[in-house]
Regions:
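Alpha-helical transmembrane segments in multi-pass integral membrane proteins
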Residues: 11-12, 23, 27, 35-53, ...
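Function-critical hydrophobic alpha-helical transmembrane segments in multi-pass membrane proteins
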Residues: 174-198
């Protein structure tokens, strides 16, 4: 944590030093210098890059997703019996992604809110766009080309819904190659709502609102299940029915700023308790979900899973030196987590019930997924992120010049 905070404040400190060097060459009164110090303060360079174990957890999550789609590699009775349980490990993987997203985004927003007293919404949305849109729309364009050539089955409604990040609310959504975008839709819809709420409500009220939503979310799911039967197949795919999973991560980020809460939760993280959570997450929850479906997931299943993953996330962040933490922070594991977004996007054309490319060999399929994801990361994601950083730096320099001109 300390390393993360030092890195997050190093850029502002450097910019502040540069500002002081500029100001020191100009004769000014004490009042004027004080005014300049306020006006010229650069934007904080915020990052969550060095939070330990998160990339490793992303890697575990994407492994669960790929494994849940790999039922075709099994044969006969093994395939029929294992598919139902493995399918829910894909749900588990996505749930971990949701909790991590809520935690990371809130952590980033809180650091800006604490540093500047506000949240630059335009800046936040631009940064999210550079992070998410390039790889997503390249994948969507690729599917569009294949669809026009008759190589994949797709509908116009599903394609438009994916393009507008509303696939998860389109009741007639179809087509395997876009069947995984529902989780990306939830995250994008969440990104639109949560920063606005946090800016309006502030940290304390925002936490209270998040907890209230978590408490009423099971009721919302039950009502949706009972009174919107056409959307029952999307019960776990809509923002209003899964927002509590993201909010568990948000609440953890806010509460982690309270030393007394951190101390209490650290005491709770006893090996026996953590072992029980792992048994529940990896064994009990998938079996109950497979056995009872929405009757378990809607009133209690998603809530228990989100809460359990949040505590395990807290443990992984707080104890990176533990055996689990050391594994999660191994370079190959972390790298898989870094490219997990591209893996998630492109695995759909190689893996699952209707893959575009069916190799018949699981090892070759995994290799193709990794090679495609690496290409997507280095050719699409990294250049977009470099461009985003250059624009950030240019914006910072422009802001500094404008503020100096005010003097």
């Amino acid at each position: 944590m300390n390393a993360m905070l030092q890195q997050q404040h190093s850029a502002p400190a450097q910019a502040e030093t540069e500002r002081q060097n500029v100001v020191s060459t100009q004769p000014a009164s004490q009042d004027e210098t004080a005014r300049i110090a306020v006006v010229v303060r650069p934007k904080p360079r915020l990052s969550t890059r060095n939070i330990p174990s998160l990339d490793g957890l992303r890697a575990i999550s994407i492994i669960f997703v790929i494994a849940s789609h790999a039922h075709w590699a099994l044969t006969g009775t093994l395939s029929r019996s294992a598919w139902r349980n493995w399918h829910y490990y894909g749900v588990l993987g996505v749930t971990v992604f949701f909790v991590i997203s809520g935690y990371l985004i809130t952590n980033l927003l809180l650091k800006e809110l604490d540093t500047t007293g506000s949240i630059r919404l335009k800046h936040f949305y631009i940064r999210r766009a550079f992070r998410i849109f390039p790889a997503f729309y390249v994948y969507l364009a690729f599917i569009g080309v294949l669809w026009s050539m008759g190589l994949v089955q797709q509908t116009l409604g599903s394609y438009v819904a994916a393009f507008t990040y509303t696939w998860n609310y389109y009741p007639y959504a179809a087509g395997w190659t876009l069947g995984h975008v529902w989780s990306l839709c939830i995250e994008e819809q969440f990104y639109l709502c949560w920063p606005l709420l946090l800016l309006w409500a502030g940290k304390v009220r925002g936490l209270r609102i998040a907890i209230c939503i978590i408490l009423v979310a099971p009721f919302i799911r039950v009502v949706t299940y009972e009174f919107a039967p056409v959307m029952r197949g999307h019960l776990g795919m809509m923002l209003h029915t899964r927002i509590d999973t993201l909010l568990f991560g948000c609440a953890l980020a806010v509460l982690s700023q309270d030393p007394s809460f951190v101390a209490k939760l650290r005491r709770l993280c006893h090996p026996l308790f953590l072992g029980g959570l792992l048994v529940f997450v990896l064994l009990v929850s998938p079996v109950l979900s497979a056995r009872f479906g929405g009757s378990y997931d809607a009133p209690i299943g998603f809530t228990l899973l989100g809460a359990s993953i949040s505590i395990l996330l807290f443990y992984c962040i707080q104890w990176p030196e533990s055996p689990v933490g050391r594994v999660l922070n191994l370079w190959p594991v972390r790298h898989l987590g870094v490219i997990s977004y591209s893996v998630y996007l492109w695995q759909q054309i190689f893996d699952g019930s209707q893959p575009l490319i069916h190799t018949r060999y699981l090892g070759l399929t995994l290799l193709l997924i990794l090679l495609t994801a690496e290409a997507s990361y280095w050719v699409i994601e990294r250049p977009a992120l470099r461009l985003r950083r250059r624009l950030d730096q240019r914006s910072d320099r422009l802001t500094m010049r404008m503020n100096l001109a005010v003097r």
